[in-house]
């Protein structure tokens, strides 16, 4: 808080300066701006603090110089009001850290402070109201005058509210919406209006048209797939033939499954019988091979015996030729008889085995 210093009271500052006669009122100024600004009371500041605040405003007094404390007069006050009128409103120009008082900074507007004026502090709210009336009308962008829908109006209102709260950035109008057709265009219509009802009916008709088109395409495809003898084109006849054809296919599938199952069982049984017969043939062939091997061994023994008998015959040269021939004839006959008997036995066994196999 700045120390209380004596200052000369100026009646013009307490009662406010009259508006300039030649300055016309702005056409687009808000109707309640003067009343809102006039309601602001700076009862806790003296003249020195007010001058310090005016000096600290950025860009407010670029064209003139603020007189020092104690040297102000009516002309200086008028110059100050003129500079204030040419600048932006106080709420938009002053940064946020100048609007609210805090510890270690400038005092706030509503903070109480010492007053050295005998008749109270000057009414700066009236001076601000006069400055707002003398301010030029802001130039509006053409895009801001166009009608928006409910969502865009809400966005513009929030943007303007944030600008009034102290945002120094330049206002950028939202981009114009692209022209919409079809269902998106129907959303902009007010609910319950004739336009909304008409768009809703159009959308319903479009949905129904697509549904009927899909149904017709499906029925035509069935008519091409299902065989038809009479060539009927009616939708009901096509559907009836399709149902009958589906039942016929299901019956054929069931019969085919039953036939395939029976054939598989018969094939398995036949394979089992063939396998058993193959095993029996293998067993008989093995027995025949063993019998043949045995007969060949016996025949070899008999041949050896005949060779031994033939070598011992010329040992006695004194024997008569008749006796020698008789013995050799007897031995040959015995060998022949043995061979024939063994051959007959082998053939008998072979015939018996063949009969059993058949």
Curated annotation (Swiss-Prot):
- Which top-level group of life is the source organism from? Eukaryota
Q: Where is the composition biased (Polar residues)?
A: 79-91
Any one Gene Ontology MF annotation carried by this entry is:
DNA binding
Q: Where are the compositionally biased (Pro residues) regions?
A: 18-29
- Region: Disordered; residue ranges are 1-40, 62-212, 308-358
What residues does the bHLH domain cover? 199-249
In this chain, composition skew of type Low complexity spans: 179-190, 331-346
Pfam families tied to this protein: HLH
- Region listing for Helix-loop-helix motif, in residue ranges: 213-249
From the UniProt entry, list the residue stretches annotated as the region Basic motif: 199-212
- One CC-aspect GO term: nucleus
- Where in or outside the cell? Nucleus
Which intervals carry biased composition (Basic and acidic residues)? Answer: 195-209, 347-358
The signal peptide, as residue positions, is none
Sum up the protein's function in the record's words. Answer: Transcription factor that may regulate the expression of the gene cluster that mediates the biosynthesis of psilocybin, a psychotropic tryptamine-derived natural product.
Record protein name field: Psilocybin cluster transcription regulator
């Amino acid at each position: 808080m700045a120390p209380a210093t004596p200052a000369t009271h100026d009646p013009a500052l307490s009662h406010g300066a009259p508006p300039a006669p030649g300055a016309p009122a702005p056409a687009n100024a808000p109707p309640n701006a003067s009343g809102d600004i006039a309601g602001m009371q700076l009862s806790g500041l003296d003249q020195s603090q007010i001058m310090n605040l005016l000096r600290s405003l950025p860009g407010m007094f670029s064209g003139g110089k603020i007189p020092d404390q104690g040297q102000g007069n009516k002309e200086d006050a008028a110059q100050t009001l003129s500079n204030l009128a040419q600048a932006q409103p106080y709420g938009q120009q002053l940064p946020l850290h100048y609007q609210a008082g805090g510890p270690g900074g400038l005092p706030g507007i509503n903070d109480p402070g010492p007053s050295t004026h005998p008749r109270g502090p000057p009414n700066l709210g009236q001076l601000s109201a006069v400055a707002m009336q003398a301010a030029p009308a802001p130039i509006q962008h053409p895009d801001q005058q166009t009608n928006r829908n409910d969502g865009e109006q809400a966005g513009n209102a929030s943007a303007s509210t944030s600008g009034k709260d102290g945002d120094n950035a330049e206002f950028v109008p939202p981009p114009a919406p692209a022209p919409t057709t079809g269902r998106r265009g129907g959303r902009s219509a007010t609910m319950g209006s004739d336009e909304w009802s008409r768009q809703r009916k159009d959308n319903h008709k479009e949905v129904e048209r697509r549904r009927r088109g899909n149904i017709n395409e499906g029925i035509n495809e069935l008519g091409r797939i299902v065989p038809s003898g009479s060539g009927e084109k009616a939708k009901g006849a096509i559907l009836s033939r399709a149902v009958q054809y589906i039942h016929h296919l299901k019956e054929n599938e069931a019969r085919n499954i039953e036939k395939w199952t029976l054939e598989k069982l018969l094939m398995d049984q036949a394979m089992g019988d063939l396998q058993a017969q193959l095993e029996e043939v293998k067993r008989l062939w093995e027995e025949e091979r063993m019998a043949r091997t045995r007969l060949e061994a016996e025949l070899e023994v008999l041949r050896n015996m005949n060779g031994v008998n033939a070598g011992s015959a010329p040992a006695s040269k004194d024997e008569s030729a008749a006796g020698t021939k008789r013995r050799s004839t007897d031995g040959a006959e015995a060998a022949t008889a043995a061979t024939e008997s063994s051959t007959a036995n082998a053939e008998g066994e072979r015939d018996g085995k063949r009969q059993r196999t058949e």
